[in-house]
Amino acid sequence: MRVVGVRRALRFSPNNEEKDLAILRAVVAPWNGEIILEEDPSLPELLATASVVFSMARTSWALSCLDEAERRGVCVLNPPEGVRRCARTVLQRLAVASSVPVPPREGTAGWWLKRGDVAAQSRADVVFCPDREALDRALADFRSRGIDDYLVQAHLPGDLIKFYGVLSTDFFRFFYPGDDGQSKFGDESRNGRPHHYAFSQYDLHAAASRLATAARCPIYGGDAIISPDGFFVLIDFNDWPSFSRCRSEAAEAIRQLVMKAEESTPKG
């Protein structure tokens, strides 16, 4: 079985390049899998001989190449269609349809303006706006950059947690970034030090799983806010995070997806 790992373009891994590479290496290591950058022109040639592809790719070209591999019967994780569905505005619709709690548009503590078409590539793609004037300026900046697909969400006080999961396995973990200080852009500091409010871990896992299922994205991560009364909302959801806080466990769970796919494939 030939296993290939497709590394996402570096612009999609801001401040996380090595962490993203590390999880991909951990996943493909037992098979001595080859890792290739999604923008490498030789990607189609490599995919032509692959049996299993673990992909973090996000560019349209790479996703099209992976579509073709899927049509040939190659197991691709995450599926390219799932990655496309992880655009923020698409996820918002899927979350509402799947009864997954998300922030309202209006609140009393400011707003977050988020680029909706692709994952954040820089700090300028996710902007905190403390008042209406700041929101108007941020919207004008988006328009000047040609960004007309965006999401506006109210900022909600509470504990910020990061969660990580792999569908069809027992793997689901969450962490408080305020405890260890790990951060991509530093936005987590807006919610301050965590209070570790009590909440239903089962319900959080269930909500994240519903969204991952709707998005067809089995390898996922995201952020949630826990309020003092234990209510939570999902504020972000990502295809294949770095899993840096739980890399070994995550890699094992991701590999389980291949075994499950093989078990469900009809034998000739």
Question: Residue locations for each model-derived region?
Answer:
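Conserved N-proximal alpha/beta basic substrate-recognition cap immediately N-terminal to
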Residues: 8-104
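Short glycine-/acidic-enriched loop or helix-start segments at secondary-structure transitions
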Residues: 15, 63-66, 88, 122-124, ...
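Active-site nucleotide/adenylate-binding loops and adjacent lid/helix of ATP-dependent enzymes
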Residues: 2-10, 71, 81-160, 198-202
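Short, solvent-exposed loop/turn segments at secondary-structure junctions
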Residues: 10-11, 59-60, 82-84, 118-119, ...
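A long amphipathic alpha-helix within ATP-dependent nucleotide-binding catalytic cores
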Residues: 183-234, 238, 246, 253-267
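Anionic group-transfer/hydrolysis microenvironments
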Residues: 116, 155-156, 164, 223-225, ...
